[in-house]
Design a protein with these regions (language model features):
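Conserved acetyl-CoA-binding loop-helix of GNAT-fold acetyltransferases
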Residues: 82, 88-105, 124-129
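A short beta-loop-alpha structural element at the N-terminal edge
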Residues: 2-14
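Acetyl-CoA-dependent GNAT
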Residues: 8, 27-85, 96-97, 102, ...
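Terminal substrate-recognition subdomain of acyl/acetyltransferases
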Residues: 80, 138, 146-159
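Helix-loop element at the rim of GNAT/NAT acetyltransferase active sites that forms part
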Residues: 15-32
Length: 159
């Protein structure tokens, strides 16, 4: 498995994987799925979009961009998506490790996750194992697909 920069030829697969996570309604704040036009614009607008690929097949992706502007512009934010049929194979770990490296290369000093859903224990365990620090808990900060309000846990990692 390698992680590389996305190309325009990847857009269809990136949209498919992204929309799987949006449709699940338990991890991403977005409610609207991407189409070819909005997806191409979305991935191009990121500071970096990485894809996890093996034997020409894309299994996951991450997006990396500033978390804020101006005096806080040195803090970046990222989101990760792994195809449903590839989960549990440590692809997320490879995406996070590549993202940490890429964030530093791009001049960011901190990677911050704003809204890790508290019940997303696999992601939280991974982040903590990789040295991320939880900043606290925001009660009811994420509206799940079923309407339930779940706590969110912001995390950060110095680059």
């Amino acid at each position: 498995m390698t992680v590389r920069k996305y190309t325009d030829q990847d857009i269809g697969e990136l949209i498919r994987i992204w929309n799987e996570v949006v449709e699940d309604g338990i991890a991403f704040p977005q409610e609207e799925e991407l189409n070819m036009r909005s997806g191409a614009e979305f991935f191009a607008s990121q500071s970096y979009t990485g894809v996890a690929e093996e034997d020409g097949k894309i299994f996951g992706l991450y997006i990396l961009h500033p978390n804020n502007i101006g005096r806080c512009g040195h803090i970046c934010n990222a989101s990760y998506a792994v195809s449903k049929n590839a989960r549990g194979k440590h692809i997320g770990e490879q995406l996070v490790l590549d993202c940490l490296k890429k964030g530093k290369e791009l001049g960011f000093r901190v990677l911050q996750f704003n809204a890790v859903v508290e019940s997303n224990v696999h992601a939280r365990h991974l982040y903590e194992r990789l040295g991320f620090t939880q900043l606290g808990t925001i009660p009811g900060g994420f509206r799940m697909k079923d309407g339930y309000y779940e706590n969110i846990c912001p995390y950060y990692h110095e680059l």
